[in-house]
Amino acid sequence: MPAAPKQRKIAIVGSRSVGKSSLTVRFVEHHFVESYYPTIENTFSRIIKYNGQDFATEIVDTAGQDEYSILNSKHFIGIHGYIIVYSVASRQSFDMVRVIRDKILNHLGADHVPLVVVGNKSDLKSEQRQVSLDEGRQLGEEFQCAFTEASARLDYNVTKAFDLMIGEIEKSQNPSQPAGGSKCILM
C-alpha cells in the first residue's frame, strides 16, 4: 500500500504583475492566462510527486505586495514554504524580493524559512530584461535558497519551481538528510 501523501502548504508572493497567478494556473491547470486580472487571493491544490513521495499541496496565490502592504496572517499560518516571484523585466519587483523575504522572516521570528526565488517572464526579449540571470542566482546564494528563472507563458521551469519548493521544505523538515550536497540549489 503506498504511503499517504504528505500535506504541504505553499504561499506564492511577490510584487504586483510579476506573474504569480500565471505560474500557479500554468502549474495546476496547465494553461496560460493571457489577460491580467489582479488577484485578491486564490487557493489551488495539486499532488506533487517528489523523490517517489506524493505531496498533497495547497498553493495560496496571494495579491501583489509592495513595501507598504501587510502580509495577512493567513500567509503565515500553516505555510511550509514561500515562492517569491519577480519579473525579469522589472528591477523594482526584484528589489522587492528582499523586502518581502524580510517581512516573512520578521513575522515568523526566524532566520531561515524554506524559500524559492523565481525570476518569471524569462521568455521576454533581452531588451526588456532589467534583471540578469546572474543577479537572480546571486540572490538565491545570499538567501541560501533555491532559485530558477521561469516562463509561465512557455511553461518553462514552472514545474521545476514547485519541485524546488518541495525540496526546500523537505530539507528544512529533515535537516540530517543530504539534499544534493549544499544548502542552495541553483538551476
Curated annotation (Swiss-Prot):
Pfam families with a match to the protein in the record: Ras (PF00071)
SUPFAM superfamilies attached to this UniProt entry: P-loop containing nucleoside triphosphate hydrolases
Residues involved in GTP binding: S17, G19, K20, S21, S22, V33, Y36, T39, N120, D123, A152
Query: Residues that bind GDP, according to the entry?
Result: S17, V18, G19, K20, S21, S22, V33, E34, N120, D123, A152
Which segment of this protein is annotated as the motif Effector region? 36-44
Gene Ontology terms for molecular function: GDP binding; GTP binding; GTPase activity; metal ion binding
Family from the record:
Belongs to the small GTPase superfamily. Rheb family.
- Purpose of the protein: Small GTPase that acts as an allosteric activator of the canonical TOR pathway, an evolutionarily conserved central nutrient sensor that stimulates anabolic reactions and macromolecule biosynthesis to promote cellular biomass generation and growth. Plays a role in virulence.
Protein name stated in the entry? Small monomeric GTPase RhbA
State the species of origin. Answer: Aspergillus fumigatus (strain ATCC MYA-4609 / CBS 101355 / FGSC A1100 / Af293)
Gene from which the chain derives: rhbA
